[in-house]
Regions:
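Nucleotide-activated sugar donor-binding and catalytic core shared by glycosyltransferases
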Residues: 1-191
């Protein structure tokens, strides 16, 4: 059925070699991406603020569930600290939704960015990241930024997915390592 398979991760090679399936390691595009041009961030980021990057998801179903949780997180952090700038890494599709909810929450130490080059630079200058489970966790890990992974979905969907998928972790980094390297707050723990 397979003539040849292209591998995203080097560790996959031993599995396909064992099964005598022709393969070539090509790498993961997110892990090899380098910003070609740098943007001056001095107008975007106050010098006296530490950046916490936030990833609420790219799909509206994810964003609508995770955004209120992330806004509550910001409020809790603001009660204890005043030296953080929270930056939402948005898509063009969810940028307005995030901005509208920030206005309703009456928070002023938040920025929303959607430019890919700027997002990469912001992430590399962050002291911490909170992200949804998914490919973005690879990007965060590659940037060597401490993080946690959050994910929450409709209860019935969660039960359905949990019955189909028999893995211990939600984050690809933890799945690869078969242990919790990146802390996960999933479903009921994500509040």
């Amino acid at each position: 059925f397979l003539d040849h398979i292209l591998l995203l991760f080097n560790f996959e090679k031993k599995y396909f070699d064992k099964e005598n399936i022709n393969n070539t390691f090509v790498g993961h595009p997110l892990l090899e991406k380098n910003a070609k041009s740098k943007t001056d961030l001095s107008n975007l980021i106050p010098k006296d603020k530490k950046i916490i990057s936030l990833f609420a998801g790219s799909r509206s179903s994810e964003t609508s569930v995770l955004l209120p949780i992330l806004l509550d997180f910001i409020k809790l952090m603001n009660d204890k600290f005043n030296d953080y700038l929270f930056v939402f890494h948005a898509t063009e599709e969810n940028k307005n939704y995030i901005n509208d909810n920030i206005k309703l929450a009456n928070l002023d130490n938040i920025q929303v960015i959607s430019d890919e080059n700027v997002k990469s630079q912001i992430l590399s200058n962050s002291v911490f990241a909170v992200s949804k489970s998914g490919t973005v966790s690879l990007e965060i890990c590659n940037a060597k930024i401490p993080s946690i992974v959050i994910y929450k979905m409709n209860f019935l969907n969660f039960i359905f997915v949990k019955s189909l998928v028999k893995i211990k972790y939600a984050n690809i980094i933890n799945i690869i390592n078969n242990k919790e390297v990146i802390p996960e707050l999933i479903q009921n723990e994500c509040n």
